[in-house]
Swiss-Prot record:
Location of this chain's protein in the cell: Membrane
Top EC class of this enzyme: isomerase
Family classification: Belongs to the cyclic ether formation enzyme xenC family.
Organism lineage: Eukaryota, Fungi, Dikarya, Ascomycota, Pezizomycotina
Protein name as annotated: Cyclic ether formation enzyme gkaZ
Source organism: Penicillium citrinum
Gene Ontology, cellular component aspect: membrane
Role summary: Cyclic ether formation enzyme; part of the gene cluster that mediates the biosynthesis of GKK1032, fungal natural products containing a macrocyclic para-cyclophane connected to a decahydrofluorene ring system that show potent antitumor activities. Within the pathway, gkaZ functions synergistically with gkaB and gkaX to form the cyclophane. The pathway begins with the PKS-NRPS gkaA which, with the help of the trans-enoyl reductase gkaC, synthesizes the polyketide-tyrosyl acyl thioester product which can be reductively off-loaded by the terminal reductase (R) domain in gkaA.
Origin: domain of life: Eukaryota
């Protein structure tokens, strides 16, 4: 049982690091120029595709994503909140997947990246 818990914790830390990577990519292109550029070019499309009802600017949506990534990364990093963080991650990944599939541009790349993240998250939940 402890091995399964250790695996789940390791996967949760991996997801927390990915959230930190996303924060960095949203705020600066210094360390990941291609990922930053992809996020910046896709953000207005996501705003129109799924977040139109919020009525926020692209810049506001970017900082909302940064806040979500920071909160989720914190939930995943704290042992007492990790189970909750994994469930929140699963829900947010489903929203992101839905948004990417509505865009229909480079859908295979977006599908595969979300499939990998969903697989990691579901594996961490399953072995927990």
């Amino acid at each position: 049982m402890t091995t399964a818990r250790a695996l789940s914790d390791g996967l949760a830390y991996l997801l927390a690091c990915f959230n930190a990577f996303c924060i960095q990519a949203h705020l600066t292109s210094r360390f990941s120029p291609a990922f930053s550029k992809n996020l910046a070019t896709q953000l207005p499309h996501h705003n129109k595709a799924i977040f139109w009802w919020l009525g926020v600017s692209d810049e506001t949506l970017r900082y909302m994503f940064v806040s979500l990534n920071a909160g989720l990364g914190l939930l995943l990093a704290l042992p007492g909140w990790r189970s909750t963080g994994l469930k929140v991650a699963l829900a947010l990944l489903c929203v992101g997947f839905t948004s990417d599939m509505k865009l229909k541009e480079k859908w295979l790349l977006h599908f595969l990246s979300h499939l990998v993240l969903l697989s990691i998250t579901m594996a961490a939940i399953y072995v927990r």
